[in-house]
Amino acid sequence: MFFSNQYIKQRIQKGEELRELGRNPYDNQLMRTLTHAQFLQKFEALKSLESEEKRDESAKESIAGRIKFLRHMGKAAFAKIEDESGILQIYFSQNELGEDFKMLKKLAEVGDIVAVSGFPFVTKTGELSLHALEMKILTKAIVPLPEKYHGLVDVELRYRQRYLDLIMNPEVKETFKLRSQVVSSVRRFFEERGFLEVETPMMHPIPGGANAKPFITHHNALGVDRYLRIAPELYLKRLVVGGFEAVFEINRNFRNEGMDHSHNPEFTMIEFYWAYKTYHELMSLTEELFGYLFERLGLPKILPHGEEMIDFSLPFRRIPYKKALHEIGGVPLEVIEEKEKLRAYLIEKGVRLEGEMGIGKLQAEAFDAFVEEKLINPTFITEFPIEISPLARRSDENPQIADRFELFIGKKEISNGFSELNDPLDQLERFKAQVAAKNAGDEEAQHMDEDYVWALGHGLPPTAGEGIGIDRLVMLLTNNRSIKDVILFPALKVQKSDYTILKEEEA
C-alpha cells in the first residue's frame, strides 16, 4: 500500500490537522512579489547601513519556496527556504505571527512548500533575511526528504527519482540550466547564419542515416511496422534536394544498443546540412560554433574533465585517419594497409573480432582500440575509410577514402560530418553492399532506401552535413563523466519498485 510507513502517516495526519484548522494543505491562494534572488538584490543596500538595526519595516514583500532547514528556538524559529533562484533565510517570531507561529511549530516540516510575507532585515551575523509577519503552508509534503539538509548521494536513486535529485542537489539544477542554454545557443547560432530549422519524422518506414540497430514499433492504422529514427539524415538531405540550402534539426534519436557512461538509447543531436559547401568548411563552422558557445556561456577556454584538462583554444587539431592510427595509436605503417597483417596485429593485441571484415572495418577496430582513448583536446580526424562511410562522398584523390571527419574531445566522438554522397548510382551500390552485410549478420548495417536513391536522382547539389551530440557536448562543458548526469530522465535497468514509501519502518 502506498504511503504506509509511520513517518509518512505522521505527515498525512498533520495535513488533516491543517484542514481541521480551516487551512488547505494544498493552498493555491498566494501572491509572491519577489523571487529569493530578486529579494536579495533589491535589499542588498541594507547590509551597508551604519545604523545598529539594519531593517526596512515599510518594505513588505512575499516570497515562496520549499523549507530546506527549520530550527525552533523557544518563541522564535529560523528557516532556510529555497526557490529556483536560491535560498533565503526567514526569521519567525511568535510575537508577530501568533497563530501562524503555532501552526509553524506544530505542523510545518522540512520539505513543505510555504509562502511567507514580511520585511527585510540583516541579522547580527550579517545575513540579509526576511522577518516574517505572515506565513502559510502551500503544499504539505508527505514524503520526507532524504538526509534532511545534507543532500542525496545514492547515484542510482538520483537517476530514478530525478525530482528528488533536483530538490537536494543544487548543482544538478545548474547542469540542466546550462544544458538548456547550450541548446538555445546552438539554435541561435544556426539561425543567425541563415539556416532553417525543420522537423522530420520520428517514425521511419525504413531505418537509415546511421549504422545502428533500431527500435521497432507498429502502426495499427496502417498495419505496418515503423522504426524510431536512428538519424534524420536522409530526410534532411531530401529537403536539400527540394531546394532548402541550409537546414538543421535539434531532436531525439533512438538506437537499440547497449548503455554505458557515454551511450543512452535515446539522445539529442543537432544535424545540419549546407548546400554548396564541403566538409572542410564544416570543420571551420564547427570551430566557430564552439567559439560562439564559449563566449555566450562565459566559459574559460580550458575546462576540467575528470582528471584531464581540455584546451578548447582555436583552431582545433586536424589529423588524417591513417596518420592517427600510426602516430597516436602506434600501429605500424606496414600493417595499416594490409588486411591480413592488420587482422593478425589486432588479434595479437587482444582485440576481439567478429565475422569477416574488410580493411576499412579493421582499421576502425584499430582506431577504437588504440586511438580514441588518447584524444583529449579537440581533434578532427579526417579521411575516413570509405567502407565505414556509406553516405559520404568519395575523395577525388583516393576513392578508398571518404571526405569525412569526426571531432573527438575528451576521448569521445562529439560530431560526425562529411561532404555528402550525391551520386545516385554510387549510393545505390553502397546500399547494396550494406544490404549484403546485413544479410551476412551485421545487425547495424543500413537498409536499402529506394526513395532516397530516387530523390538523389533528381539532383542533390554539392552538400556538407554534420551531426553533433548535445548530451556529450554538455558532459564536456559541465565536467560530468556519465551521460546519465546530463539527461533529466535517463534509461535505466528495470527493477522492482523500491520506493521507501512502500516500506513499513520500525520506530
Curated annotation (Swiss-Prot):
It comes from the Bacteria. Mg(2+) 1 binds at residues 406, 413. GO terms for molecular function: ATP binding; lysine-tRNA ligase activity; magnesium ion binding; tRNA binding. GO terms for biological process: lysyl-tRNA aminoacylation. It catalyses: tRNA(Lys) + L-lysine + ATP = L-lysyl-tRNA(Lys) + AMP + diphosphate. The keyword Nucleotide-binding applies. Homodimer. Belongs to the class-II aminoacyl-tRNA synthetase family. This is Lysine--tRNA ligase. It comes from Wolinella succinogenes (strain ATCC 29543 / DSM 1740 / CCUG 13145 / JCM 31913 / LMG 7466 / NCTC 11488 / FDC 602W) (Vibrio succinogenes). The lineage of its organism: Bacteria, Pseudomonadati, Campylobacterota, Epsilonproteobacteria, Campylobacterales. The gene is lysS.
